Amino acid sequence: HGVEPQYDHRVEPVALEEPINFTHPDFAMTLRFLNYNTGPSLLYYSYDRGHTWKGPFNLEVSGKTNILARTDYIVLDEKRCMIFQSMSKEDNHEGRPFCAITEDGGLTWEMVGMIGPEPEGFGIMPSTVKLSDSEYLTTIRRREGDRRWMDAWRSTDAGKSWKLLPPPVEDLGEGNPPSLIKLKDGRLCLTYGVRAEPYRIAAKISEDKGKTWSGEMVLRDDGAGRDIGYVRSVQRPDGKVVTMYYFEDKLKPERYIAATIWLP
């Protein structure tokens, strides 16, 4: 959104020629689109926890470049990794979710399965957990007309086909992406921003692999407007969850990055 400035240090993307070691102890990867309706998308990776990055590299899936990437991946082994993304619909608008896999360290990516039928509105920004070798659960930001909510889909065949589950969140206001993690005790923790009054950061817990969800737990509700959210959560060794997001409150006009540390 907006006008992109000219960067003197801009690097043009190239094809990845050296396989990525997905199991490097300090590995991180980010996937980013250049246009949110038509792509293409780029891949960057790091072997020092994000201090320095290699890339950009072109991201192509089964010959398609209309990938609308946001970062959502699950490492399987040294050379195999699954990504959960969206691509352009038939009308060249965002977006239809899918999953893909590489088996050669990111040199090539192949489509595994589409996540649901093509929507009239959009299904974007998946956040996914692996429940077993063949079972995955993904949560997806959805929009149809004036309705904004969150869907959940479950696969029991390693991403080839997906079954729709009851929606974890029925109303997100103006919409916001999910962050889904699997806790150490096996429960699932879903965090998200709500762009409706009271503007807030919230969480839900599932004890049955996403079939049902707890009531909403409000982490904070002092937002000054709807420009909040885009949550990421991680569980610490002590069991507490660190939930990060951008936020605006009534104390100052600028948006800022914040975190809430809480015990699920």
Located regions from the model:
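Asp-box/BNR beta-propeller blade signature and adjacent active/binding-site loops
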Residues: 1-264
